[in-house]
Structures are given as structure tokens and as C-alpha cells.
Amino acid sequence: MIKKYSKEVTSCQISNSKKLKSLIFLGYLPPVNTLRKIGSTLKEEISFPAELLYCNKSKLAQLGCIVDKEILFPYTYPYTSSTTKILRDNFADLYKDTIKKIDIKKNDLIIDIGSNDGNLLSNFKNNHKVLGVTPEKIGKLAIKRGIPTIINYFNDLTVKKILKKYGKAKIITATNVFAH
């Protein structure tokens, strides 16, 4: 059952070296943010091995199991990044740091991959052209807040659509896309 929804990492995702060292194994963990309704019957949850592997050749630490994106970030994903004050503050700081370091013009495109409810892009939207990409229906909240959002996974087809409709981005952000 696990193999249906995941893929074991047998070689480094950067160098292709098969010499991977296990740093820590935390057991089997279910995907986070799969909330059940209060009072509902507890059912067995699918779990995946949580092992951190290290490749000496590339120096990359990586998870030993790649879980299907539709399991980790389903359309019904319940979490909204705007809920957490510290995250709102961190994203505001990221915006301030970015505009100090990079000369961004009004028409430069900023894309956030895994944009969720548009929390990060809300900092950029008044002075810059923004676009969110997120697979969850929560992206509709961003659209209501005036943040153009593509509700889909970030993949080759999505990239082609973005390039055709919006052009190339000056800045691409991706936060909480390595959540598991």
C-alpha cells in the first residue's frame, strides 16, 4: 500500500550516487494536516517511513521516501498560512529583505509556488505583479484577496501556461514545499 503512494529514494536526487547514509530513522509517520471530524470513528492511517539520508558526494540531506504530492497536498488541504501570526510576520520580513537586496520593478513578476492562501504574496501585491500556484482549494481565498492564483500543482504544464500568459518571473519563492 505504501508503494502505491510513495517512492523509495535509492540514489541521491542531485548526484545519483547510490552511497546514501542513514542519519536518523523516526519510524513511520502519517501525513500531517489530515484532520478527522470530532466524533468520527478513528480509522487506520497510511504511514510512511521518515528517514533522513545523506549523500557525501553532493552533501545533500534528503528524505528516504518521496510521498505522492496528492497525499501531502490534496485539494482539500486544511491549513492556511495566514492563520499563524509568526508566519505572517516572517513573510513580511522576507518581503522587506527581498526588496532591499533585489531591484524589483512594478511590472516584474513574483511567483510563489505552494502559495496557499496568498499570505506571502500579499506583501508584494500592492507594488508588484504577483502570481500564486497552489493545488489546494484554499487558493480561492488568495483570489478573493486580489492575488491571481493558479490552482494546480507546479509542473511542466503549469510552467508553460505561466510563460505563455504571464512571462518569466523575476523572483520565485517556495515555502513549506518540503513539509514532510
Regions found by a protein language model. Give the residues of each.
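Fe-S ferredoxin-like electron-transfer domains
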Residues: 50-55, 59-127
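Surface-exposed beta-strand edges and their flanking turn/coil or helix-capping segments
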Residues: 35-39, 76-78, 88, 135-136, ...
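Sparse, context-dependent recognition of short Cys/His-centered cofactor- or disulfide-binding micro-motifs
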Residues: 5-8, 38-40, 89, 95, ...
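Conserved SAM-binding loop
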Residues: 96-180
